């Protein structure tokens, strides 16, 4: 085992330079793949993928990414392991980390992945929790870099104050750009996470604003983004949320208030006619699906970076 064990649980734990280094590694790997030059930088390594929440993009991107890097990915659902049947998190962590080289977890409570990481002997990656979705933000920022939009970012997030919103706040705080968040009353971001982001923003020069007015958030924005109004586990609230979020759909009228060259991002799956209109989604479909593909490349950059830290 090398000298340094780093986990990727939230962007809060990473410096600006580290985030940019991970992005750059991902971009280089993507470039190499497109030119049919694959470096097996994780040859013979095994990634354990624990899914307590199901996903299309997370499983496909991590499994494909590990294969392209020369390694193997092992899919584990609650039905496959004792973690879903009462075994203590700390026991599962010690067992799996003794057999695998890296672990990705997609789960509910953020405290669950924090406990797992505290007992793991190998890097743990947050594939999504109720509080954060940091791997998605790596892909989002990589996409902005590819489109030459990383300078003077003014980002607007319109919708639910959820894990995506929290991760956007951390990215803005770390990289020093402006982020405006618009949510309905009662669906604001977590106050503790907001205060943490604002504290970091003081050092980086970032500007983070929260409002209940979508127009205030979107005006002049260079990037507009949203997420589903009803996350996994909130299905019983769906009809109520649709009523409450009325006026928060990103449509052509809302996008017309953004900068003339503004781009729209969505982490997917997208529910057209709810958080985004069919017209806006299709108009920006090229960048959206490039953003989706970049989950693969950004996560490869992350896994390579985490592996290198063990050998410093």
Curated annotation (Swiss-Prot):
It comes from the Bacteria. Keywords: Amino-acid biosynthesis, Arginine biosynthesis, Cytoplasm, Transferase. PROSITE patterns: CARBAMOYLTRANSFERASE. Its EC number is 2.1.3.3. Its main location: cytoplasm. One of its GO terms (molecular function) is ornithine carbamoyltransferase activity. This is Ornithine carbamoyltransferase. It comes from Sulfurimonas denitrificans (strain ATCC 33889 / DSM 1251) (Thiomicrospira denitrificans (strain ATCC 33889 / DSM 1251)). The gene is argF.
């Amino acid at each position: 085992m090398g000298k340094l064990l780093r986990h990727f649980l939230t962007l809060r734990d990473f410096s600006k330079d580290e985030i940019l280094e991970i992005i750059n590694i991902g971009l280089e790997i993507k470039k190499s793949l497109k030119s049919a030059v694959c470096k097996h930088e994780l040859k013979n390594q095994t990634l354990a993928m624990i899914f307590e929440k199901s996903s299309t993009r997370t499983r496909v991107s991590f499994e494909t990414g590990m294969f392209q890097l020369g390694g193997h990915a092992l899919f584990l659902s609650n039905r496959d392991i004792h973690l879903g049947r009462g075994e203590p998190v700390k026991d599962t962590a010690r067992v799996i980390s003794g057999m695998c080289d890296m672990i990705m977890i997609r789960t509910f409570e953020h405290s669950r992945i924090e406990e797992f990481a505290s007992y793991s002997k190998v890097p743990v990656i947050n594939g999504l929790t109720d509080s954060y979705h940091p791997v998605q933000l790596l892909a989002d920022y990589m996409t902005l870099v590819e489109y030459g939009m990383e300078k003077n970012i003014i980002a607007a997030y319109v919708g639910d104050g959820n894990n995506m919103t929290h991760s956007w706040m951390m990215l803005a705080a770390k990289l020093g750009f402006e982020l405006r968040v618009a949510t309905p009353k009662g669906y604001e971001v977590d106050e503790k996470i907001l205060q943490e982001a604002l504290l970091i923003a003081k050092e980086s020069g970032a500007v983070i604003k929260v409002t209940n007015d979508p127009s205030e958030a979107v005006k002049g924005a260079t990037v507009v983004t949203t997420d589903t109004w009803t996350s996994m586990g909130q299905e019983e609230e769906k009809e109520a949320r649709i009523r409450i979020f009325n006026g928060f759909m990103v449509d052509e009228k809302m996008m017309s208030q953004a900068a003339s060259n503004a781009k729209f991002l969505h982490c997917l799956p997208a529910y057209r006619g709810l958080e985004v209109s069919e017209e806006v989604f299709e108009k920006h479909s090229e960048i959206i699906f490039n953003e989706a593909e970049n989950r693969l490349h950004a996560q490869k950059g992350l896994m390579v970076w985490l592996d290198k830290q063990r050998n410093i």
